[in-house]
Amino acid sequence: MGFKNICKQGSQLYLNGIFPERILARKLKNCAKSYPRTALTIEVLVSSVLGALKVILIPCASTYAALTLPLRALFNAIKTKSCQHLASYAMAWLLNILTIAVIIGLVFSLVFIPPPVVFISLGLLMSVTTSVTLFQVHKNLFPPYEPPPSRPHTPPPFADEYVPLISESYFD
């Protein structure tokens, strides 16, 4: 497996750990096709609530994923009898460890910042996490539009007959 595939699968595992609503959105694609307005309404409500809670949920989800990803990788290797996906799980685990380290660094740096700046930054962080949650749910609920395959162009039934142009018939 190439490095590009390892990075792609690792990032997908990481994002599925941080945004578990992505998995639910992928499973409900067919319902969203049938009822798009209802799906959009539910999507906005869910992303508003979960996005505001992501300030607390992202550290919890990262810690949970950092603890369970090695076990999931082990179970996947036993189930498939192959170590092919271990690098992807290691990549996702490293991303979770990096996320935890950044969060710990931010918490310690917030101690030295004045309280008004902390509250403004928390408000901005909550709005960003709400937007990212909405984007992740929407991207997995409504996949990009793929036009149907085009049919080969068939000529009109009487293609060999001469059809005069408008300008030619005007001068007759």
From Swiss-Prot:
Keywords: Cell membrane, Membrane, Transmembrane, Transmembrane helix. The chain crosses the membrane at residues 44-68, 86-110, 117-135. InterPro entries: DUF5422 (IPR035358). The keyword Cytoplasm does not apply. Changing residue 96 to H: In strain: CWL029 and TW-183. It is a multi-pass membrane protein. It is found in: Cell membrane. Coiled coil: none annotated. GO terms for cellular component: plasma membrane. Belongs to the chlamydial CPn_0442/CT_006/TC_0274 family. This is Uncharacterized protein CPn_0442/CP_0311/CPj0442/CpB0458. It comes from Chlamydia pneumoniae (Chlamydophila pneumoniae).
